[in-house]
Every structure is written in structure tokens, then in C-alpha cells.
Swiss-Prot record:
<dbReference type="InterPro" id="IPR014746">
    <property type="entry name" value="Gln_synth/guanido_kin_cat_dom"/>
</dbReference>
<keyword id="KW-0067">ATP-binding</keyword>
<comment type="function">
    <text>Catalyzes the synthesis of gamma-glutamylcysteine (gamma-GC), the main low-molecular-weight thiol compound instead of glutathione in halophilic archaea.</text>
</comment>
<dbReference type="GO" id="GO:0042398">
    <property type="term" value="P:modified amino acid biosynthetic process"/>
</dbReference>
<dbReference type="InterPro" id="IPR011793">
    <property type="entry name" value="YbdK"/>
</dbReference>
<comment type="similarity">
    <text>Belongs to the glutamate--cysteine ligase type 2 family. YbdK subfamily.</text>
</comment>
<dbReference type="Pfam" id="PF04107">
    <property type="entry name" value="GCS2"/>
</dbReference>
<protein>
    <recommendedName>
        <fullName>Glutamate--cysteine ligase</fullName>
        <ecNumber>6.3.2.2</ecNumber>
    </recommendedName>
</protein>
<dbReference type="GO" id="GO:0004357">
    <property type="term" value="F:glutamate-cysteine ligase activity"/>
</dbReference>
<keyword id="KW-0436">Ligase</keyword>
<dbReference type="InterPro" id="IPR050141">
    <property type="entry name" value="GCL_type2/YbdK_subfam"/>
</dbReference>
<dbReference type="GO" id="GO:0005524">
    <property type="term" value="F:ATP binding"/>
</dbReference>
<keyword id="KW-0547">Nucleotide-binding</keyword>
<dbReference type="InterPro" id="IPR006336">
    <property type="entry name" value="GCS2"/>
</dbReference>
Length: 359
């Protein structure tokens, strides 16, 4: 990875890219070291060539779709990559599972990757990174101007708590019930340069920040700016990183549809000369906390801060405004966190683990 990107990379509007982090699991559905075998020691299917990588723990693996020029093809690309990963894992004696945190993952019992980048992070960050067994969904949308991308990222912050509430799929961490709907949201926020970013006036301001962080040794590369949304100066995209990982591809595609339509809508508003909203980070953090704690039952602060709105109200507003159906489908289905708790209570931990496996 190049240390920094460039404004010149922002050349395409509306393209898509989907990154997913998964757990490598054994025959019992428990996270296990497997990325060395799957990424380095065996040859993956052609569709995964250059699109497969390991993460901090040897039990976490990441896939990336190719650039998707037509959003209508997102489902085919996503399923093709997922199917190839499952086949590759099974051919080597592993399974693949997805959630924001795996309920059976105990970080002290799991191996960290040996890649120099991760060794540097572990040494620099220490405990918060040592325990970071999280897995998320990252959606990239191409933006054709760097200043526009920064403006869009600023505006997207308001919508992130709704995404997190609908995606909440990590009630368990280190083997116990946290009482949260998305414990991943809190575990990951313990790292530096995470959570809700502040606003940037333009791309120059963002680039200056990125450069200062590198020059001062705060980060080793731009990829270590792990905010919930960021202009990706390498890909020329706006990257949304808020949602928990999901086993069901239909849930993933609902978020992809929503993020894409949001970015396109905001880009048009920028082009129309709309002024951005100066939202206090404290209120954004409050809404994120409510999403972490309550998931789909959350009451989120309204834009004018005069009242709260239920997730159901916000889903109705966003679905009607953007013409997206997937949000309603997400809302009316049992949430990932609710399903995990129900399965553990009714059928036990092995049924819970099995429910997270991709097939």
C-alpha cells in the first residue's frame, strides 16, 4: 500500500467496491488460524486472484470485489467472490463465517498475523489492537472529484448510526454477552483514528491531515485512518466502514444499495451548491452509541436535535427519499444480534456458530 494517495485518483462517479472480513473456522465453527494456508500456501480460485488478504488475526480473512461499474451487477460479483472463498476454504479443511464479532472467538487463544504491518500496529497500539477480533463490511463508492468526495464523506456521517443499528450483529465478545447489539462498534473504537471523524473543509485539508499523521509517526500508512467513513485517496472513493459483518449476502446488498444511493444523492447536492451541515461530533457520537446499545430499537436524535426518531421512522424516510427497498427488508427481519441471542438461548452455542457459516 502506498503511504498516501492523490486527488488525481478521484475520476469515476458511482462505481462500487465491496470489502468483507470473514472468520476462518474449524469443523465445529470455532475461529481458527487458516489465513496462511488460504492466502499464501495454496492457490485460490481465479476470481480471488489479488482479491484475498489476511487481517490482524490469522482467523480473519478479507475479500474484495473487482471495481463494479454497473451497480446492478453488485449481487453477481459479491456472490461469485463469496462462493469462491467458501470453496477454497472447504478444499483446505476450513469453513467461513461472518459476524461483527464471532461469539466463540477468545482473543488470548488466537494467533496474530506475522505481517510486519500488523507487528508494527501491535507494538505501537498494544492492548486495544491485541484484542481486536472485529470483522466489518466496507462499501466503496467512486466519486469523480476529490473536494466532492470530502464533502460527501462529511455529510455521510449523519447516516452512519442508522446503518450500524440495522447491521448490528455482534452481541457477544470474548465468550460473553455484552448487553450491546454491536459490541464490535465499541471494541474497534478503542483503537486510535476510529469512530466518527470531524469535518474537513476540502481535500487539501484532508490531505494535510493525512500527511501530518504520517510525518509524525502516528500512522504507518493511510490505511490506518480507520474512521467509520473516509475519502479513500488511493481508490478515489468514499468508503463507508460502519456496518458489522453479515453472513447473508442479501443483507450486504441492502447496505450496498443504500450507501450507493446516498453517495450519488449527496454528490448531486454538492454539484447543486448545497452547503454542508456543521454537525457536532458529540451528537454524532451519541447517535452511534444509541445504535451500538439498542440496534433496531434505537431512538436516534433528529437532525434539529429537538426530538428523537425511531429506526423505523428513519427507514421510512430514507426508503421513500432514495427509492431503496432494502432498508425495509432489513428492518422487518430479525436483526443479527437478536438472532444470535435467540439461537444461543434455544439451541445452544453450536447452533449459534453454525448459523454464522457461509454455505
Amino acid at each position: 500500500m502506498d503511504a498516501t494517495g492523490s486527488a488525481e485518483h478521484f475520476t469515476r462517479m458511482g462505481t462500487l467496491g465491496i470489502e468483507e472480513e470473514f472468520y476462518v473456522v474449524d469443523e465445529f465453527g470455532r475461529p481458527t488460524s487458516g489465513t496462511d494456508e488460504l492466502v499464501y500456501e495454496t492457490e485460490p480460485p481465479a476470481v480471488l486472484d489479488g482479491r484475498l488478504d489476511h487481517e490482524l488475526f490469522k482467523c480473519v480473512i478479507e475479500t474484495q470485489t473487482p471495481r463494479i461499474d454497473d451497480p446492478a451487477n453488485a449481487g453477481d460479483h459479491l456472490r461469485s467472490v463469496r462462493d469462491a472463498l467458501v470453496d477454497h476454504a472447504e478444499a483446505n479443511g476450513f469453513g467461513i463465517a461472518a459476524a461483527g464479532l464471532h461469539p466463540l472467538a477468545k482473543w488470548r487463544e488466537l494467533e496474530h498475523a506475522e505481517k510486519p504491518r500488523y507487528k508494527s500496529q501491535l507494538d505501537r497500539i498494544q492492548y486495544p489492537q491485541h484484542r481486536n477480533t472485529t470483522a466489518g463490511l466496507h462499501v466503496h463508492v467512486g466519486v469523480d472529484d476529490a473536494d466532492k468526495a470530502v464533502w460527501v464523506a462529511n455529510e455521510l456521517r449523519w447516516h452512519l448510526p442508522l446503518m450500524l443499528a440495522l447491521s448490528a450483529n455482534s452481541p457477544y465478545w470474548n465468550g460473553f454477552d455484552t448487553g450491546l447489539q454491536s459490541a464490535r462498534g465499541k471494541i474497534f473504537e478503542a483503537l486510535p483514528n476510529t469512530g466518527m471523524p470531524t469535518t474537513f473543509d476540502d481535500y487539501d485539508a484532508f490531505e494535510t491531515y493525512e500527511q501530518r499523521m504520517l510525518e509524525t509517526g502516528s500512522i504507518d500508512d493511510r490505511g490506518e485512518l480507520w474512521f467509520d467513513v473516509r475519502p479513500h485517496s488511493g481508490h478515489g472513493t468514499v468508503e463507508v466502514r460502519a456496518p458489522d459483518g453479515q453472513a447473508d449476502p442479501d443483507r450486504v446488498l441492502a447496505f450496498v444499495e443504500y450507501v450507493h444511493e446516498l453517495v450519488v444523492d449527496l454528490a448531486e447536492r454538492y454539484e447543486d451548491g448545497e452547503s454542508g451541515r456543521r454537525l457536532r461530533r458529540e451528537f454524532l457520537d451519541e447517535n452511534k452509541w444509541r445504535a451500538i446499545r439498542h440496534g433496531q430499537s434505537a431512538e436516534l436524535l433528529s437532525r434539529d436535535l429537538s426530538t428523537t426518531r425511531s429506526v423505523e421512522e428513519l427507514v421510512e424516510i430514507e426508503s421513500d427519499r432514495l427509492g431503496v427497498d432494502g432498508l425495509w427488508e432489513l428492518y422487518h427481519r430479525e436483526s443479527g444480534a437478536e438472532r444470535q441471542r435467540r439461537l444461543r438461548s434455544e439451541e445452544g452455542v453450536m447452533a449459534l456458530a453454525d448459523s454464522l457459516r457461509l454455505s
